[in-house]
């Protein structure tokens, strides 16, 4: 029995020693990768980071730097086959980093930015699916941002609407949806007539809800003003435009008053 215990302890020591050696080797190889990255040798740097990760997959900074290196490789060839592969690997690396450091905000920011930069909207939806199923407002908001920045207005509007439903007393959720609608109308003059009015009315409604929640915040008034101006463009004559422009001026003045009062 004593021999068994002694052998077991020795085995544990050997495993710990081997693990320690792997960690040291991983850090050494990662150092080589960093040098190659700074020399602009991206493919070699990526290969070295991958080698380092094999020695010790639990070093978060290696996964983070592997993500950066792959993102840089994607940016060199965004429309090519190699760029597509690098984008997928960047997402995988940042996801691995987040598994090791789930509370690190940098990882979340880098992953979201990678989804945006590489136009991987579907991958983002898949990644955030567990949180979406829980109706998590932050996940819904993040997907709204990604959809918006990848040119998917309808999807962004849907995510922001779901965020409002999930967190109805959050004025920022209402404002985000209103701003999205204003931005779309402002940049899509081809949306005309009743379609333009209906969409503007949707944005105005959620902004008025935001005003009810935070009556002293200037932003909802500012964007209500802007949406009334976009709405007025659906009309042709000055007489038709006048009611919307008068409303716009009313909310603009209120926004200015609140901004001055806040100083």
Kindly give the residue locations of the regions a language model identified:
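Canonical positions in the second alpha-helix
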Residues: 51-52, 96-97, 130-131, 162-163, ...
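Position-specific recognition of the canonical hydrophobic site in helix A of tetratricopeptide repeat
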Residues: 37-38, 71, 82, 116, ...
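Short coil turns that delineate tetratricopeptide repeat
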Residues: 57, 102, 134-137, 168, ...
């Amino acid at each position: 029995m004593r021999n068994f215990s002694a052998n077991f302890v020795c085995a544990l020591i050997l495993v710990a020693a081997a693990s320690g050696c792997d960690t040291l080797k991983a850090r050494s190889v990662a150092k080589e990768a960093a040098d190659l990255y700074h020399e602009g040798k991206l493919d070699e740097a990526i290969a070295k980071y991958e080698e380092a990760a094999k020695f010790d997959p639990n070093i978060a900074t290696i996964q983070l730097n592997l993500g950066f290196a792959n993102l840089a490789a994607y940016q060199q060839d965004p429309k090519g086959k190699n760029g597509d592969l690098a984008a997928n690997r960047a997402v995988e690396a940042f996801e691995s980093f987040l598994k090791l450091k789930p509370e690190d905000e940098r990882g979340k920011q880098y992953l979201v930015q990678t989804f945006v930069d590489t136009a991987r909207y579907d991958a983002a939806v898949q990644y955030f699916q567990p949180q979406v199923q829980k109706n998590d407002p932050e996940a819904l908001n993040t997907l709204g941002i990604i959809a918006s920045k990848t040119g998917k207005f309808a999807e962004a509007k849907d995510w922001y609407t779901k965020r409002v439903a999930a967190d109805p007393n959050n004025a920022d959720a209402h404002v985000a949806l209103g701003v999205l609608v204003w931005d779309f109308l402002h940049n899509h003059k081809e949306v005309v007539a009743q379609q333009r009015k209906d969409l503007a009315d949707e944005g105005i409604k959620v902004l008025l809800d935001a005003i009810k929640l935070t009556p002293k915040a200037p932003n909802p008034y500012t964007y209500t003003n802007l949406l009334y101006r976009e709405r007025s463009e659906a009309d042709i004559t000055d007489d038709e435009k006048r009611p919307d422009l008068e409303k716009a001026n009313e909310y603009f003045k209120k926004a200015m008053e609140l901004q001055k009062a806040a100083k």
